[in-house]
Every structure is written in C-alpha cells, then in structure tokens.
C-alpha cells in the first residue's frame, strides 16, 4: 500500500527519532504492531493535517496495514520518494491560508453576536500582521468575543512563525466553536484538499 509520512529534517522520525534509511530500504517493526506504540506509521491524504513536519515522503507499507484514527500502521515499510513540493514556502502559504480561514469563521461568529462592524474590520485584514493586530485590538474591545478573537490572534501568530500544524489546529477549533463537530471535520477536509491540490497528491491515498 502506498501512503505518506512526515519526518523531521534528515529522514528522522518526528516522535520516535528513528533515522530512516535511504529510500528503497525496507524497515521491519521489531514488535507487535500497535498504533502509537510500535510498527511503521504513515497516513492517508485525509490525515496529512495532523502530522505536518519538515519533510513529506511517499512510503510503501507491507503486510497487514491497519487503519487507525488519523493514521495507518503496518509491520514493514520503506520510503519511496520525497514530496519535493512540501517546502518551507509551501508551509508558510498553507499556514496563511488556514489563518485566513479562521479569520472568516471568527467574522461569521462576530456577525451572529451582533458585532458586524468588528467582522468587517477583520474581513479587511489581508496580511497576517494586520490580522494579528486587529484580533488583539478587538479582543480588548469586545469582552463577549474575547476567546474567539484570542484564538484567531494565536493562529495569526503561529502562521507568522510558520508553525503550520498549530495554525491548522487553531483554524479547525475556530470552526468547531462556530458550528460544532461537523464544521471541525469539514475544516480538516478542506486542509487536506489544500495540501493535495498544492502538492499534486492523489486524494485517495
């Protein structure tokens, strides 16, 4: 089965710190396969937003592949090729796109709460710096929307730091605050589609 795997720089496991060999070399799990504990972990395209890191690789999984929440796990796997399109610049663009999505969701929440003027002020923000400044200012001015606006500001701040995973997480939680769990899932789907389209990945993996 072909899937994807995020690694830190130098083909290093994000959590395990395992040093992956050159592409094409098989790695076998030393114990029983158990999600988040042992085995070769990878993800489908729908799982990508949960696992962002420095490098994205195409990986082949062998033997029995188990699907778990937001991940795949198998007894064996080998890296095939790095996805060159996932670069720091791509990460910045993704983080900015997520932050602007959070802007729109927060603006909708403000309109519902009777703060249409504040929503228009947010809608006029076209850069992350503008969004950060506006969200902080409005959070101080509108006590009943302080939490949502603080979350929005945190998302803009994380995007400025190119913390794309954190920005995506914040955007998804802005969605759940607005419209519940279904909106959270929809936001994660949007994030996955953005990555697939930008990186040229097949959405069925």
Q: Where does each model-flagged region fall?
A:
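Short, glycine-biased loop/turn motifs at secondary-structure junctions and
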Residues: 1-205
């Amino acid at each position: 089965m072909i899937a994807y795997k995020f690694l830190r720089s130098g083909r290093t496991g994000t959590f395990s710190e395992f040093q992956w060999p050159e592409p094409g070399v098989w790695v076998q799990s030393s114990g029983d396969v158990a999600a988040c504990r042992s085995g070769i972990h990878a993800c489908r395209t729908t799982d990508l937003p949960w696992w962002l890191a420095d490098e994205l690789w195409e990986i082949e999984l062998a033997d029995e592949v188990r699907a778990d929440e937001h991940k795949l796990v198998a007894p064996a796997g080998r890296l095939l090729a790095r996805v060159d399109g996932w670069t720091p610049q791509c990460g910045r663009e993704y983080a900015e796109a997520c932050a602007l999505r959070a802007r729109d969701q927060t603006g909708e929440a403000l309109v519902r709460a009777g703060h249409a003027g504040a929503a228009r002020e947010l809608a006029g923000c076209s850069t992350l710096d503008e969004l950060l400044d506006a969200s902080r200012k409005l959070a101080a001015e509108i006590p009943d929307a302080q939490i949502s606006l603080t979350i929005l500001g945190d998302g803009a701040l994380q995007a400025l730091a190119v913390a794309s995973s954190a920005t995506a997480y914040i955007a998804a939680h802005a969605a759940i605050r607005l419209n519940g769990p279904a909106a959270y899932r929809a936001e994660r789907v949007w994030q996955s589609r953005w990555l697939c389209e930008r990186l040229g990945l097949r959405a069925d993996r």
